[in-house]
């Protein structure tokens, strides 16, 4: 155990009582718990994502519902369900929990995380969501094979058919449509692509709305990049653009803050100032999109602190019952809404340490 962890444990009671005092006994939400997570050697990338997901209510509710079922052999989802259940059923309202079982399982299942080096929070989020979806799909498949699926359809799909959607997909999955218009015959072709999170490029002194608009900018395909048009049966100049066709329940936006620099032969951090609003409406939607006017509220932000992808630290800010909290491993603090501006990034292009929003979680209104 490190000196930092020992010091943290000594301060647990102080931090916890301070948090309860800051929130106030009358304002403290009923049946809510705010627990920090112990760092097991550069596991802040994991802790920060887990805290963000815990405060994405639809995700938390489904994980806890999974825990309530009679279960099976241990896997990453059972360990996550145990952790969420442990937080949700604590007698105390605030405190610290060691996610030891989850971390051990994670390291056992994926060599990428089986070390004490700093990892990328976005890579972990992607791995976690896909792994949970795979587990749920495999369980559904096994239930069908065992004849345990109640009210089963007699016309079941073939074995090689597309896997069933899970609650992970229902919460996070959106659809992009790639539209290409031939400039000779005006024929428009489109190809759909599903996503669980959306990665967008960042520029200096911009906003999330600007980043999303750039994501869907029209690109002209000409010269050597000409498009083969099936209607013209030849290569033609064309215009290509990406639009959002299906909006997810929770929109996870990944800001591409790490860029490979040829002259340095390594990735460096783009600490650009990117404003992320508390409310968001997407305008880069396709003409046939469902719920065009869907409004989103910011519920969590995973923040990267430092100057590079393999060094630094991750923290999370979340919105819970109308107020904001900062989770820094085992430390939990109440913060003002105005303090969120500190995590937009830096206005200077000079590479230095910064606390910058890295993964944003926006939840749609009912």
Curated annotation (Swiss-Prot):
Interacts with WDR48. Interacts with WDR20. Interacts with DMWD. Component of the USP46/WDR20/WDR48 deubiquitinating complex. This is Ubiquitin carboxyl-terminal hydrolase 46. Disulfide bonds: none annotated. Its EC number is 3.4.19.12. It catalyses: Thiol-dependent hydrolysis of ester, thioester, amide, peptide and isopeptide bonds formed by the C-terminal Gly of ubiquitin (a 76-residue protein attached to proteins as an intracellular targeting signal). The active site is at 44 (nucleophile), 313 (proton acceptor). The lineage of its organism: Eukaryota, Metazoa, Chordata, Craniata, Vertebrata. The keyword Cell inner membrane does not apply. Zn(2+) binds at residues 182, 185, 229, 232. Residues 35-365 form the USP domain. The keyword Transferase does not apply. It is found in: Cytoplasm. Keywords: Behavior, Cytoplasm, Hydrolase, Metal-binding, Protease, Thiol protease, Ubl conjugation pathway, Zinc.
